[in-house]
Amino acid sequence: MTRTKKNPPLRVGVGGPVGSGKTTLLEMLCKAMRDRYDLVAITNDIYTKEDQRLLTISGALPAERIMGVETGGCPHTAIREDASINLEAVDRMLAKFPDADVVFIESGGDNLAATFSPELSDLTIYVIDVAGGEKIPRKGGPGITKSDLLVINKTDLAPYVGASLEIMESDARKMRGERPFVMGSVKSGQGLDQVIAFIERQGMLDV
């Protein structure tokens, strides 16, 4: 392990609209980082634990290291206005795995206005996808403008949906200013190294 156990675990929130690739990103991050870091993951769904099931089936982490939370209502409420259900889930996972280096918290499918409570997440990654249209970055919203890292996913689909990656990149730069963003296709691994490097650097995992 790279990180000393004297440090508290890094909590990384992963948000974005339904179908943007949040669960796939989380799966790929876990598979790429699990040999270097002690990881646990918490997923949010409104009425099911589908994302927990998908992560478990994919072998991202051992089943006991993945916890599903049923929010039973508006998904962004459970990560922002009343994050108690997720804070409790974090506490339960850390009681089982006190040496965890990173706690990944995936929100349920949400809108562009959703953000993570600072009580819940140290770093936030917001995922949008090219299939949603090239206009998405310029629509703004806290997820796009204020997240620590924006991931513009599924760039390989641009030719099929008539989206201009150049326009999306330009708009993302305008909306985010100095805040970083990554363009890629996480399912194929494109851009994944950049996301991991960001987590390690900003989360001081490599200290």
From Swiss-Prot:
CDD domains linked: UreG
Domain of life, source organism: Bacteria
Gene Ontology CC, one term: cytoplasm
GO molecular function terms attached to this record: GTP binding; GTPase activity; nickel cation binding
Subcellular location, record wording: Cytoplasm
Keyword GTP-binding: yes
GO BP terms, alphabetized: urea catabolic process
Record's signal peptide: none
Keywords: Chaperone, Cytoplasm, GTP-binding, Nickel insertion, Nucleotide-binding
Entries under InterPro entries matching the protein: CobW/HypB/UreG_nucleotide-bd, P-loop_NTPase, UreG
Binding site for GTP: 16-23
The UniProt record lists the keyword Nucleotide-binding: yes
Stated family: Belongs to the SIMIBI class G3E GTPase family. UreG subfamily.
NCBIfam families recorded: ureG (TIGR00101)
Protein's job: Facilitates the functional incorporation of the urease nickel metallocenter. This process requires GTP hydrolysis, probably effectuated by UreG.
Subunit structure: Homodimer. UreD, UreF and UreG form a complex that acts as a GTP-hydrolysis-dependent molecular chaperone, activating the urease apoprotein by helping to assemble the nickel containing metallocenter of UreC. The UreE protein probably delivers the nickel.
Protein name stated in the entry: Urease accessory protein UreG
Organism: Cupriavidus metallidurans (strain ATCC 43123 / DSM 2839 / NBRC 102507 / CH34) (Ralstonia metallidurans)
Gene, per the UniProt record: ureG
